[in-house]
């Protein structure tokens, strides 16, 4: 019954996926992708045509001047660190106008003291929280922008917060407001979990840089590692010098044997993201009917692939994650347990029986072991797998007496 009710929404998701599929295809054809581009290089990686062509494809998809798409970028957090730290200098200030960013950013910024943080380089940080209703505190943002404000970081996805994920349209409104006050400020969007969810990306509404991970949406489940930064030419140049070395920049960086997976994963990404979106909507609909608070709720529009469900107890959180793990194609026999994961301020439990370690476009669930014991569910390389994962999570909760089935 739930799936029948969702038919109209699923049709709309398919329409967006088709649009984005053709957008990716068009960029690949425009840049004349050939078989030779699928092979990698070794050593320094000079004249890596596959790498350079893929970066032009990303720039076309995101409608930017340039892009950096590299296996040497380890994860989303690393991509953000490269983008931010390369475009700031001592005495500059970083501003987050959408509240506190994801936990792993704390140590980059120096919110939690850490070796090599921006704070150690005399780069200050200011933050303006969202208003209680989830809207932007425009007055607070106006006051926070000063002569030192050099870069603004806007996290699209909610992360581990209970705030709404931002639509591309809302991000555009925020960027316009900021640029009207200080046109030269660099606006960067953490695009993790948001790629291909809408027909447009934040770089099409004024973002100077969009940043993400290839083991999330744009890798399509095939990229074994990597990250991307797409944006203004000068910003990307700075990022490339930080990732490699001053004087080297984008010219070096061997792709070994990942090019084929990067290309093929990108080609599949719009349909993979569509399946993950359907899974998230299905999760909200079944868990809401079972009496749990879901963010976003069953009816709300989606701007990323993450579904948060407030389970209320540690037992519920653990049971949910055990169900997701049991539904995995890899390591389905393993039992996830909470642990002190680097970069987080509380124990975290993670379930991911994935082909790529830590891949969150594959069926996965995680959450910090603290009030309100919310689990964050995302991914599923196919909609059918996402659906099965959700049903397994309900089964495990039912077995523990934490879920009533009407």
PLM regions and their residue ranges:
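Conserved PLP-enzyme active-site core in the AAT-like
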Residues: 1-7, 14, 24-30, 34-37, ...
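Acidic, PIN/NYN-like endoribonuclease modules and their adjacent C-terminal/linker elements
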Residues: 17-21
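Active-site-flanking structural segment that lines cofactor/substrate pockets
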Residues: 38-68
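Short helix-loop-beta junction
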Residues: 60-64, 114-123, 329-330
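Structural motif
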Residues: 66-69, 92-95, 150-151, 184-187, ...
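Conserved C-terminal alpha-helix-loop-beta "cap" of PLP-dependent enzymes
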Residues: 288-405
């Amino acid at each position: 019954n739930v799936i029948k009710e969702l038919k109209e929404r699923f049709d709309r998701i398919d329409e967006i996926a088709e649009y984005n599929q053709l957008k990716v295809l068009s960029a690949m054809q425009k840049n004349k992708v050939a078989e030779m581009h699928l092979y990698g290089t070794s050593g320094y990686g000079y004249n890596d045509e596959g790498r350079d062509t893929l970066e032009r494809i990303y720039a076309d998809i995101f409608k930017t001047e340039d892009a950096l798409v590299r296996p040497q970028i380890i994860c989303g957090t690393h991509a953000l660190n490269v983008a931010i730290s390369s475009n700031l200098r001592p005495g500059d200030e970083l501003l987050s106008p959408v509240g506190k960013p994801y936990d792993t950013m704390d140590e980059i910024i120096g919110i939690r003291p850490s070796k090599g943080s921006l704070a150690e380089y005399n780069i200050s940080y200011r933050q303006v929280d969202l208003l209680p209703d989830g809207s932007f505190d425009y007055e607070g943002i106006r006051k926070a922008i000063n002569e030192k404000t050099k870069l603004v970081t806007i996290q699209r996805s909610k992360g581990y917060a209970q705030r709404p994920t931002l639509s591309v349209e809302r991000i555009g409104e925020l960027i316009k407001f900021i640029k009207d006050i200080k046109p030269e400020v660099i606006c960067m969007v953490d695009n993790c979990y948001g790629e291909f969810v809408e027909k447009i990306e934040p770089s099409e509404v004024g973002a100077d840089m969009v940043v993400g991970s290839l083991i999330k949406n744009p890798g399509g489940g095939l990229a074994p590692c990597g990250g991307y930064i797409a944006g203004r030419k000068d910003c990307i140049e700075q990022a490339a010098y930080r990732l490699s070395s001053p004087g080297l920049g984008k010219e070096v960086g061997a792709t070994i044997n990942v090019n084929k997976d990067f290309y093929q994963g990108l080609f599949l990404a719009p349909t993979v993201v569509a399946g993950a979106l359907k899974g998230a909507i299905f999760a909200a609909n079944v868990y809401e009917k079972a009496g749990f608070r879901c963010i976003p709720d069953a009816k709300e529009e989606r701007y990323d692939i993450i579904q948060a469900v407030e389970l209320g107890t540690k037992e519920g959180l653990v049971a949910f994650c055990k169900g997701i793990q049991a539904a995995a194609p890899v390591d389905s026999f393993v039992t996830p347990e909470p642990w002190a994961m680097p970069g987080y301020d509380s124990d975290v439990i993670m379930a991911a029986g994935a082909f790529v370690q830590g891949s969150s476009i594959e069926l996965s669930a995680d959450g910090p072991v603290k009030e309100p014991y919310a689990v964050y569910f995302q991914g599923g390389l196919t909609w059918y797998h996402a659906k099965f994962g959700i049903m397994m999570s309900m089964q495990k909760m039912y077995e523990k007496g934490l879920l009533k089935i009407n």
